[in-house]
Amino acid sequence: MAANVGSMFQYWKRFDLRRLQKELNSVASELSARQEESEHSHKHLIELRREFKKNVPEEIREMVAPVLKSFQAEVVALSKRSQEAEAAFLSVYKQLIEAPDPVPVFEAARSLDDRLQPPSFDPSGQPRRDLHTSWKRNPELLSPKEQREGTSPAGPTLTEGSRLPGIPGKALLTETLLQRNEAEKQKGLQEVQITLAARLGEAEEKIKVLHSALKATQAELLELRRKYDEEAASKADEVGLIMTNLEKANQRAEAAQREVESLREQLASVNSSIRLACCSPQGPSGDKVNFTLCSGPRLEAALASKDREILRLLKDVQHLQSSLQELEEASANQIADLERQLTAKSEAIEKLEEKLQAQSDYEEIKTELSILKAMKLASSTCSLPQGMAKPEDSLLIAKEAFFPTQKFLLEKPSLLASPEEDPSEDDSIKDSLGTEQSYPSPQQLPPPPGPEDPLSPSPGQPLLGPSLGPDGTRTFSLSPFPSLASGERLMMPPAAFKGEAGGLLVFPPAFYGAKPPTAPATPAPGPEPLGGPEPADGGGGGAAGPGAEEEQLDTAEIAFQVKEQLLKHNIGQRVFGHYVLGLSQGSVSEILARPKPWRKLTVKGKEPFIKMKQFLSDEQNVLALRTIQVRQRGSITPRIRTPETGSDDAIKSILEQAKKEIESQKGGEPKTSVAPLSIANGTTPASTSEDAIKSILEQARREMQAQQQALLEMEVAPRGRSVPPSPPERPSLATASQNGAPALVKQEEGSGGPAQAPLPVLSPAAFVQSIIRKVKSEIGDAGYFDHHWASDRGLLSRPYASVSPSLSSSSSSGYSGQPNGRAWPRGDEAPVPPEDEAAAGAEDEPPRTGELKAEGATAEAGARLPYYPAYVPRTLKPTVPPLTPEQYELYMYREVDTLELTRQVKEKLAKNGICQRIFGEKVLGLSQGSVSDMLSRPKPWSKLTQKGREPFIRMQLWLSDQLGQAVGQQPGASQASPTEPRSSPSPPPSPTEPEKSSQEPLSLSLESSKENQQPEGRSSSSLSGKMYSGSQAPGGIQEIVAMSPELDTYSITKRVKEVLTDNNLGQRLFGESILGLTQGSVSDLLSRPKPWHKLSLKGREPFVRMQLWLNDPHNVEKLRDMKKLEKKAYLKRRYGLISTGSDSESPATRSECPSPCLQPQDLSLLQIKKPRVVLAPEEKEALRKAYQLEPYPSQQTIELLSFQLNLKTNTVINWFHNYRSRMRREMLVEGTQDEPDLDPSGGPGILPPGHSHPDPTPQSPDSETEDQKPTVKELELQEGPEENSTPLTTQDKAQVRIKQEQMEEDAEEEAGSQPQDSGELDKGQGPPKEEHPDPPGNDGLPKVAPGPLLPGGSTPDCPSLHPQQESEAGERLHPDPLSFKSASESSRCSLEVSLNSPSAASSPGLMMSVSPVPSSSAPISPSPPGAPPAKVPSASPTADMAGALHPSAKVNPNLQRRHEKMANLNNIIYRVERAANREEALEWEF
């Protein structure tokens, strides 16, 4: 036993239980880790299996399934095995891990065993048993191993089995306890960690807060320190200041002390001297003392006198101030009064305009009827006897006799009233009256027998006119010519018809039903007629009178009735719209289909219904319209007419008219067989020059007649029509109206008829040149007088009149035959419809050219159209030549890809910078809207009608350049041709030349360049002409823009700004001269440039220009030069060194302007100053010499001169223009001075020798007389007024004075106001800015008259047509010389304007026109007021001044006669030259 125990003890001693337990622990942890891993992998495996099932197709799954299943079984088996092994291990582990070490127990057991060993006797059994029991009692002493093995340390093996079961339970219990403890420990640790983390976070936040607080406090500290430093510094400064102040104060105090001491000393010395003086006897020193004593009183006296003087001066100052205030107040009051008057008058004008607008339709109906009658009469009386119906003639004469007073009534107010009133109004009247029969004064018109005799006024009536003078102004606001409105309207139409067919057509009473009552009343009463008839007449609105407008019309009913009538008579809406409403077919259709109720209509909207009502009121109207319709359908002629016939006709008509005008002036000499009209005028017979001219014109007329018999019918009647005005009160009315109206009339007549009988081909250019030579030689220098109105008239008559013969015809048919085209006074007629009609006429009626033959006068009517200058003409509906049948066939039935076609067209348009409007007008014959629509949304070819396909066919033809309209050629054609030929006075190319011009290639390109507003034309081209030629021609710049690579707009603008600021150049100057933009636009561009890709073609242009400018090495110098020139020009203007007119500061001056006429849009941009071209003295000398040799230089001469003098050709041309006109003015002035001496009694024709018959020294064929001009001028310059003044009356002296002034101005002007190329207007002229651009669509029209047709213009300067002289005497009364000069200046400006117009270039005669509009009207009228009134004083300035005081003052009739003649001839020549000039072919084409 002992051995047993010992061996056990040894065994357990060797056995390291603790190490074993540790190893078991580590293995257990490994196992648990592995178990987790295996769980994860198991899960992963399951997921993979699912994915595999999802993703793998079934076939594969079936193939792989057995492998997978076996694999799965393996895995499952493995996992089971490992779990079992783990479980076994764990069970062992659980038993061993907590087992106590048995070694100590064994040791104790052994020791006991040893103690018990010796007694080997039996009784030992008892203690053993006890021990056994003690073991039993303390089973926990047994080691688990023993328990497991069933051994007990001492007891017998029997008991072991019973002890074993309790041991594993205890082990489990201890294990769970241990686990719990660990878990609790871990929890504790986690909680500790969490709390630590939380605390740490809080601590960090606190640290951050502290950091930010620290920073804030640091910043505050710094701020405080800074403030402290500042305060310290300021305190230091203050202290320093205080110290310096103290020092200064100390110094002052010391100085004061010193002064005080010195004063004390002086006082003491004075006192002592006084004492001495008192005490001591007068000795030699006494005088001195006296002196010192006296000096005091003397000083006081001096001071007192000074005080008195100061007081006196103060009083003077106060007095002056009060007088100044009074003056200011007075002037302010005057200004206010004038403003009030102005507003009153403008209101009156507005009212009148409204009335006119409201009442236009009546006239139109009248015209239709007149046409009808004319046609009937024409057909019935082919022989056209001139004195056809005596009673009618007598009626006419009665009317004529009646009209002078009327006319004077009408005129006076317009002359006296302020120039604001719409001059077009009295023009029109004058035209209507004066042109037809320049009514002889009643005294001279013996009232012929006839039923209407009562109408002819008694001889006393003419006095009415003058007596009216003073009231005129007052009553003006009512209506400038109401009396006329009623009376004349009543009477003129019949008169009008007389021209039409040679006899009178008095309309049926129904037509004039409303009028007769008012008529008789008109002539008799004095001033009342001005206001009187108007109420009765309603200002003339149609037969219905004013009531018609006020009453509520049933629009639906009217529309219904109109439709009914149109259907019944088979009249088309287009014709109805054109002739009756002045509207397009679309508008008519809209109005008739959906008439709005009356109350919802605007004033303008009511007009068509009023017109329709008036149209319906008389069956005659409907019949007339039907006739027109029938005739229209009957004759469809091509719209484009050969230039030949056009210009020939024009020439013919001009000459015809000229003849007529001369007759009218010679009034006394009966011209035709119409006896009643040829009543002697009471004036002396015309001079020989007049006869000569007359004979030339007669001869021309005969030649023309030989060429075209057909025109005879038309010529007979109109020729006898005019009787000259004799009353001196209206001297110039005659010219204005006669010249203007008949001119137009005749011209229209000419152009109206031609289509039907084409002239035999004769080169018009040659023919006209010869006539011009003759006329010029006859006219002498005096003949170029009235360019202005000539030009205006020309322009007026042209835009429609000559723009297309077809138009003329159409318009003529539209405007009955009042010979002057306006039998109705302007007063009761709205300007709009007529213009519309004109436009429409142009559009619609070209076909009717043929039929008009019968109505010569009808045609004239058309000519008159343009007299509604205040109205901006609608652009003509584009008319394009019809497609030829071949072209139709070629394309009509061939499939076309419209999308591709429109794309190509758009590309070509963009590339060539052609705008859609031009393209539409010139190529497709469509409006811009239609073109835009067609290009953006082309319909497929299959869906297009035949008409719808036409535009696409045209596009194809255009793309393949088979269409005449050379839209694309802009740059070449537009630049070259218009400028050169037009401006050169050399004979124009013969009309037979390029026929293609008839297709308006040129106009097209011109317009397109206009359209795109090539600013560079005006802008970049240098002002001085030479200066800035960098810019491209309009087409050019656009191509550059189209081709230009992407530019960095930002950097460009940045550079431009830098260059401008570095060189102190203003944005305005830069914008105007380089970009052609206003200062605002430039500022906007430079401050906010858009990126290149967002800009349109147009928007890119300024940037391309900037880039070009930046690349130009001389850009800054050029701008500086411009700036200097501007300054110079400004100073000259400012200090009166130069006449306003001559500053070429207007668009015109851009000599380099590539496109000959600026676009209307440009003009608005271009209202900027531009430096004049200043010529050096030697250049002027050279030019003068050249002038002596050739006043009308040929193109070669011009080019040679420009090359030699290094000037631009434009400059040379303009210099010649200016110089010629200057010479003419001087001749005129001389003439006016001489005239009183030569012909005090006043034969109209006796011209001072040398004026009308200059000695025929050899000269250039064009102007045989011009050569004398220089000599005249030199004489005048040398001798000056002295020579003249001796024989002169005071009047004449005044004129001389003016003349000198002119000469100075001229010298200035010569120095360089070469208007460059397109209309020059001075800044001073306000509105006239719009001058040159022709209204769109009238490209080829004369561009001479700057304003009249322009959009803005409320009135053309032609208004000044007011009787020329009268207006000068009465209206332009500038009581002070200054204003007088200003008048001359402003008018001069207009003179120059016309100079530069291309047409002017070709017709030198123009240059001189003088329509004396008062300068006062300058600001108001849209175009320069007139040509130089001051230069050609009608009477003398003094007379003018007197006129100011006596409105009815009269002008010397002889003078007037002479002026009228000159104006006439001037006008004739101008128009003849225009007609001959092939460049103007466009006028006749459309």
Swiss-Prot record:
DNA-binding span(s): 544-631, 887-974, 1038-1125, 1168-1227
Repeat as UniProt keyword: yes
Q: Tell me, which GO biological process terms does this entry list?
A: cognition; negative regulation of transcription by RNA polymerase II; positive regulation of dendrite morphogenesis; positive regulation of dendritic spine morphogenesis; positive regulation of excitatory postsynaptic potential; positive regulation of gene expression; positive regulation of synapse assembly; regulation of transcription by RNA polymerase II
| Composition skew (Polar residues), residue ranges | 680-690, 967-976, 1283-1293, 1381-1401
Q: Where is this region: Disordered?
A: 114-167, 415-481, 517-549, 661-690, 716-758, 800-858, 964-1032, 1231-1453
Instruction: List cellular component terms (GO).
Output: chromatin; extracellular exosome; nucleus
Composition bias of kind Low complexity appears in: 461-470, 802-816, 1017-1031, 1402-1420
Q: Which UniProt keywords apply?
A: Coiled coil, Disease variant, DNA-binding, Epilepsy, Homeobox, Nucleus, Phosphoprotein, Repeat, Transcription, Transcription regulation
Q: Which family does it belong to?
A: Belongs to the CUT homeobox family.
What is this protein's record name? Homeobox protein cut-like 2
Annotated organism of origin: Homo sapiens
Upper lineage is: Eukaryota, Metazoa, Chordata, Craniata, Vertebrata
